[in-house]
Amino acid sequence: GYPEEATYFLKRSQGWKQLFDPEKKLIFPKDRQGNWKHRNPLSGDGWVEANAWQATWSVSHGIPDLIELMGGKDVLCDKLNYAFEQAADDDFVYGYSGGYISYANQPGVSNAHVFSWAGKPWLTQYWVRRVRAQAYGAVTPDRGYGGHDEDQGQMGGISALMAIGLFSLTGNVDQNPSYEITSPIFDRIEITLDDRYYEKGKFVIQTYHNSAGNCY
């Protein structure tokens, strides 16, 4: 192994905690001297195509730590739920660095799945359904790819994962990787598996009493 490198990168992976503002309970950028650049959660200054509302939840390797810093699961879920409520009327689609939640660009497309890691999977299921329908639900500019930043197929990828009800917040890089189950829109889904790695040929997702109103 490489113990020195492991120690170095483990420390680096915790650096986001120094950017957490305990008063606003969000992450903000700092300058080289360690001072806040600003504390406007909707400003993109200091961010790459994001803002504090969109990017705070992106520490997918450290959600338990984020929960602790925020003051508990309920606090995190209430704050994130508020962000989704603010973005719903605009179909969760904004330009770069704009809005509370944006599914038109890469930085925030995992946000709906954070609820599951904070003990409220029903909120993940609810908002996954809403986002998929409103941001990816058709091929029109209003209900489809209206200004979406399609880099390397990521927006199409998150749309497909929402539709089949599977997602991995950590990108399947854990020692024991797993998928979260959300809310598939189809009654039956068959995924053909690579026989070089799996004994069985298909992975089947079967839903019962599936409807727009019965998403849990």
Language-model region placement:
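C-terminal beta-sandwich/jelly-roll accessory domains of carbohydrate-active enzymes
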Residues: 198, 209-216
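Active-site core of glycosidic bond-cleaving carbohydrate-active enzymes
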Residues: 1-204
